[in-house]
Amino acid sequence: MLEPFQILSICSFILSALHFMAWTIGHLNQIKRGVNLKIRIRNPNKETINREVSILRHSYQKEIQAKETMKEVLSDNMEILSDHIVIEGLSAEEIIKMGETVLEVEELH
């Protein structure tokens, strides 16, 4: 049986992971809003288009980096989760899959 301190530590970790997921999704939404605004170029010339493409490429790289970081954080802590935790019948693998699904759904919108 787990000690109260261990349970608190595990709950704290889960809340941190969920907060990180929410922050990442919010960050991705901000990038998407920025991308949508930047695509509308009036009177385009080659220099303006190249600058906007560069900005879009940079935003896309940030988005990919945020997703990779989130996956890394979740997978690094998978052993800790599988040793200690089951949330309403969910295994650690299922929790991580849910996090990845959230990212995929967000990516589609």
From Swiss-Prot:
Single Gene Ontology BP annotation: proton transmembrane transport
Description of how the protein assembles with itself and partners: Homotetramer.
CC annotations in GO: host cell plasma membrane; membrane; virion membrane
Site keyed Seems to be involved in pH gating: positions: W23
Cellular localisation: Virion membrane; Host cell membrane
Membrane-side (Virion surface) residue stretches: 1-4
Record-level Gene Ontology MF annotations: channel activity
Keywords: Coiled coil, Host cell membrane, Host membrane, Hydrogen ion transport, Ion channel, Ion transport, Membrane, Phosphoprotein, Signal-anchor, Transmembrane, Transmembrane helix, Transport, Viral ion channel, Virion
Topology Intravirion: residue spans: 28-109
Other remarks in the entry: Influenza B virus genome RNA segment 7 encodes the M1 (AC P06816) and BM2 proteins. Normal translation produces the M1 protein. The M1 termination codon overlaps the BM2 initiation codon in an overlapping stop-start pentanucleotide 5'-UAAUG-3'. Termination of M1 translation triggers reinitiation on the BM2 AUG in the +2 open reading frame.
TM region positions: 5-27
Record's protein name: Matrix protein 2
